[in-house]
Amino acid sequence: GHIKVEKNGKLCGCGQSGCWEAYASATGLIREANSRLTVNKSNLLYERTEGRELEAKDIFDAAKDGDEFSLKLVDYEADYIALGLGNLLNILDPEIVVIGGGVALSGSILFDRVNKKLNEYALSSVLEGLKIVSAELGNDAGIIGAAYLGMNE
């Protein structure tokens, strides 16, 4: 998550700027949505979340319901995921990519767009036969892995 995708870009939680994580993550998506919502309150996302903290799921749900504002946010997220992922695919050429974290719960509304945009960023040879799947353990993967290691050592 800490490869650079923007020179002098958004501040990341690591203290650097322009990191992939600052753009292609649930946190990055929420930050972008909140920024856009300050100037555009005429949308389904704002109506549904006014007065409470925004979650990535809210954005994906509103996009699935046809909210143009949220669909633009999903396109933004998909583009940055595809940019970073395309760079990694070009270097590593894996057979499978497992996407975890908050964006993994988005479903086809995001992943269909990521797959389409990957053609702009990855070599066609690395996309042949590539599988992109959501992590089955979700956000608990780290905790489950740590528990597994603890039990087996």
Q: Predicted segment positions?
A:
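ATP-binding/phosphotransfer module of carbohydrate and carboxylate kinases, centering on a glycine-rich
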Residues: K4-L11, Q16-E153
